Each structure stands twice: as C-alpha cells, then as structure tokens.
Amino acid sequence: MELVPWTSFARIVRRHGGDVGVRTLSCAEQFRAMAFAQLTWRESLRDIEVSLSANAGKLYAMGFRSAVRRSTLADANESRDWRIWSDLAAVLIRRARKLYLGDSVLGVELDNTVYALDSSTIDLCLSLFSWAPFQSTKAAIKLHTLLDLRGAIPAFIHISDGKLHDVNVLDMLVLEPGAFYVMDRGYLDFQRLHAMTQAGAFFVTRAKSPMDARRVYSAPTDRSTGIISDQQVMLNGHYSAKKYPQHLRRIRFKDLESGKTLIFLTNHMALPALTIAALYKSRWQVELFFKWIKQHLRIKHFMGNSENAVKTQVWCAVATYVLIAIVKKELQLDASLYTCLQILSVSVFEKTQLSCALQADLSRSDPPDLANQLNLFNF
C-alpha cells in the first residue's frame, strides 16, 4: 500500500463525500480490505473478515484502526460512490502509462501510440442482478477496455450492463490525434469511424462481408507475404457513402499460418500493408488482458448484488492490477506480473519494506508456473 497516492486519494474521497459521517472503516480502510481480497484471492466478505481477524495483531501496521466487520464492509461497498475507485484507478493508470511508455508489445517499429479496443462479458444471475440485463434468462456486465499496447496498461475502462453495444463506446473515447485504434468488426460504424478521421486519429478494423464499395486505386503487392490486395475504395451504399465520404484503404490478407483470409479497413494510406496486418494481430493483447484479470483477480464472483457494489469490486480489482504493474516497473523486477502477485499474496502481513520482500523472494528461484497460468507479456 505504500505506493498508493494517498494524498490524491484523500482529494478524491473529499470530492465524492466518501468519508462524510463515517465512524468506522474509512474509504482508505475499505480500499485496503478490497485490495487485500484481490491480492490473497478472498472469495467473500466473510472470507475477508476471518482472514483479517486471524491477523488482528498486524492490522494496525496495515493501516486498519480496528477489526473489519463484513457487515460494515458490505454497507460501504453498497453505499459509497463507486466513482471513488474509478478515479483512484485513473490516477494509477496515468502513473503506470508514464512508466511503461517505452515498453511496446507490438511486433513493428512505430512512433504512434497504439490502442486495442474490446469488451469482455461477465455473466451474472438475473434474479440477483436485475439492474444488468443481458438476455432473457441471464444478466451480465461488460468490461469495455482501451488497452495501451505500450505495457498492456488500460487507458480507458467503462463498465456497463450486458446490453450496451460495443460500438457505443466509441462515443465515450477522447480521441488522440495520430494514435491508432485497433478494433474488431463489432465496432464498424462508418459515421463514428469518419469522426475518428476528422479528429486526426487512425483506425484498423475488419470489414464486414459483403461490403458495397468501388475500387479507386490498387497498389502492387507481394502475395508471398500474405498480402493479396491493397486498395483504396469509396463506399457505394446510399447511407454508408454519406457517413464516410472519403477514401478507405481495404487490405485483403491471407494468414500463412491459419490459411484464413482477412479483410482490413483503415484510414491510414501510407503504412505498409503488412504493418497494418501486424497492428490488427496486436489486438489479441487485449484478449490476453481480459483472460489474465479473470484468472488472477476476483471479478467473476461478487460480494454484493447492487450496481454500486459490483462496480466498486471491479474498479478495486483494476486499481490492484495497475498497482502491481507499477510495483514491477518501479522496482525493476524481471519476474512476471503473476509471480509478483504470488509474492505479495503471502507477504501482505509482513512489516518489511515491499521492495525488500519482493527482492528477497525473487533472489531465490522463481515459483514454478502452473500449466494453466497465463503469462501476460512476460508480466
């Protein structure tokens, strides 16, 4: 917890009135309890209460003024504005993005910022989470994430019910001129893509089939690389042509490994076609991010049923993930993010400095990776 920006956090709490009228379990203590649950894989409020009570003599050193009761923690998760935790996560994300500025996971040399945009669905029980409708028989929330591919740090996260269509998230983004936004075809909306072009941003996505467009120009290609065609096109459809009245670049690419043929659309006319294909391939990194946090953090089983409690738990999980990434970078650790998480999970009650605890554990042999554990970009 020593790396949490507590001064900034105090301002956030004051802004949202988080500690107004609070006698026990301040917002800072609430975050410590929820982060403890993430680091040590606690599955319920009772689990948190019992685990902390078993170490009652060490609670003060962890920042707790008194024992944590599950009823008090439940009330806090239900009533305190979830935006406290989203704002804290935003502060941590800004810090982490600066630390990972030069750590690109792209397979190409590119000066531009590259983002991967996608969503992941977390299924819920409709009778318990009626505020998050998805299908007729079940509920769900969606985790919409814009991942900065320089270090796999989320630059934007939005939590919605399961019915929100992915394409609507494009309206929420603050577009960065010169940046690339890599998306699957679920985000294909020509009016919104044209807004990206007007904002000076670039996109790489896949075309839907069939696509009504006429060829304007064809560039020479080397089919041995997998590039079948590289064309500039204009949309023919009555409505689509009005929504996107400029040239689009359409690249037909055959993946030499899988044999699949993919059609990419982009508004960048100068990059080599193979680079565009490599950028789209990098979109898989956001899928790895979702798999990692679902496997290693507590966001599949919730400790409260209300919208506020669920968002509180998810945002605390995101903040914990980013904190671990910050620890790894600031201490210049060579271990994976999962290894750092393992070490922190067994040393949360230790009074030694965090850097000493991590360095001491890593000086020994790394714990063996289990076969079903994901390594996220060597994190």
Language-model regions, residue ranges each:
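Glycine-rich loop/turn
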Residues: 54-60, 169-170
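Single, function-defining residue in the core of a domain
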Residues: 1-47, 51, 80, 87-88, ...
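Major-groove recognition helix of helix-turn-helix-like DNA-binding domains
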Residues: 61-80
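Juxtamembrane membrane-interface segments at transmembrane alpha-helix termini
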Residues: 59-62, 350-352
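Extended Lys/Arg-rich, glycine-bearing segments that form polyanion-binding/interaction patches
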Residues: 92-93, 99-106
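Short Lys/Arg-enriched helix C-cap and helix-to-coil transition segments
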Residues: 84-96
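A short structural micro-motif
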Residues: 55-58, 95, 299
